[in-house]
Amino acid sequence: MPAKLLVGVLTEEKGLVSDVASALVDRFGPVDMVSCWMPFTDTSYYEKEMGGPLFRRIFAFSHLVNQGGLADIKLCTNALEDEFSRDGNRRVNIDPGFLLHSRFVLASAKDFTHRIYIGKGIYADLTLTYSAGAFRVLPWTFPDYTVQAMIGFLTDVRRRYDASFHLPDSFTPVATKD
């Protein structure tokens, strides 16, 4: 099933994001939803390289993507991070992922116990599941993906995604034999 592509952009330089968004549109097509700016305060992991305070904004793309292309999408966004870097430091962290009716998955170049290798040095991170009418946080979900602003945005994106298939909110996928 095709997936809804979402790309998170983390930066200290909010003014840079319009150029990053243009580069993303050149590669992935038009954007149909954009989140509000969300403060990124749960870790200082990126601050030495990127400064602070940091903020995240999520872009949802109009065109659905093949789930099997997530590794290539992550490699593309990694290259964009390099393009926007200065003096060897990233100015943006770009995190692609996809949304389906039942889950939200991010791509990562870092291995961890719950991540599945999908090729080309990239792993799929099941970040949130959707059941009983709401997104469900998992033990490893990044804290910034658990806040109400993020969950609300993802819920709105999910509604739009489901509408493209005319799926009711109560739809539950059923496994089929091939």
Residue spans of the language-model regions?
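Long, contiguous binding/interaction regions
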Residues: 1-46, 52-56, 65-94, 98-177
